């Protein structure tokens, strides 16, 4: 089974600086084709995350001006994190229990990546395919 570290090796990590406008952040999400971005301060410390869901629930539904509103004012600050050595199943359980689609991955107190529920489900599908192949070969081996 693939590990969290292996999944992250194939992914880029993008961040946005604190103080950015919602408009700039949304443009960045669209440009990078991502659904969530960590918001960092000048030292690289993660202050929160901004997601498509934050845009809908905290900006659009409240008729806030995306050109004037700072992402810091509407980002999610209560973060659910995973450590790099956690199993994919542990990450999936955290995501399910907290009803989130992305989880930040930390190694030695440093942000090293983001895992999405899609990443974990694709991993589960691959594992199931491998199990089916092994069982098929066992059952139909000559």
What residues fall within each predicted segment?
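Tandem CBS (Bateman) regulatory domains
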Residues: 1-11, 51-81, 85-96, 117-142
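Glycine-/small-residue-rich active-site loops that bind phosphorylated ligands and cofactors
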Residues: 14, 80, 112
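Compositionally biased, intrinsically disordered low-complexity regions enriched in proline and serine
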Residues: 15, 103, 139-141
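The conserved cystathionine-beta-synthase
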Residues: 16-33, 40, 81-99, 106
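Short acidic/glycine-rich loop or secondary-structure boundary segments that cap or lie
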Residues: 24, 46, 58
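A glycine-centered beta-loop-beta connector
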Residues: 29-32, 37-54, 95, 103-118
